[in-house]
Amino acid sequence: MNATLRANILFGREYDEDYYWKVLSACALTDDLEMWPKSDMTVIGENGMNISGGQRARLALARTVYSRADIYFLDDPLSAVDAIVKRHILDNIILSTGLLGDKLRFVTTNADNILPLCNQIATVDNGRVSVKVQTPQVHTAFEFKAATPKPAKAADST
């Protein structure tokens, strides 16, 4: 989308300055904006400034958080960010301490190290929930992995 960062985040919604800047900070975008020529009014996209994959992921997350929905489906929101930004996003958005702390959050991830932070964990296999664990039963990612059935091996075609 060729538009300013702000327009990309607002996505047609009313501008709430305080909440907007809270979201940018929680999504670890404020440091990036300090380096951009027009801060959040910089045009990004094909006809504007190119942004990195990590910045795109954080922009998409900011747009989602700014929507103020009651339910959030986050598809691997931590995959394109480094460990420091990952921790920042967990603390400031996803976990109970974050902006979405009082919302229902469904998060897909391949990051086993965050599993102990979840209050429920479900493994989906072939479109069905194959394992569901409540946190009191999960103490480490290793214990969860031990409870998760291994996928069947694909037949050798050679």
Model regions and ranges:
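ABC-fold ATPase nucleotide-binding domain signature/coupling loops
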Residues: T30-L59, P77, V81, K145, ...
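Catalytic Walker B motif of ABC-type/P-loop ATPase nucleotide-binding domains
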Residues: Y72-D76
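Conserved catalytic loops of ABC-family nucleotide-binding domains
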Residues: I84, H88, N92-L117
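H-loop (His-switch) and adjacent beta-strand-loop-beta switch element
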Residues: N110-A111, L117-Q134
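ABC ATPase nucleotide-binding domain helical subdomain, centered on the C-loop/LSGGQ "ABC signature"
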Residues: R6-G45, R68, I89-I93
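Conserved beta-to-alpha transition
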Residues: R6-A7, N126-V138, K150
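ABC ATPase nucleotide-binding domain signature region
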Residues: M1-D16, T108-L117
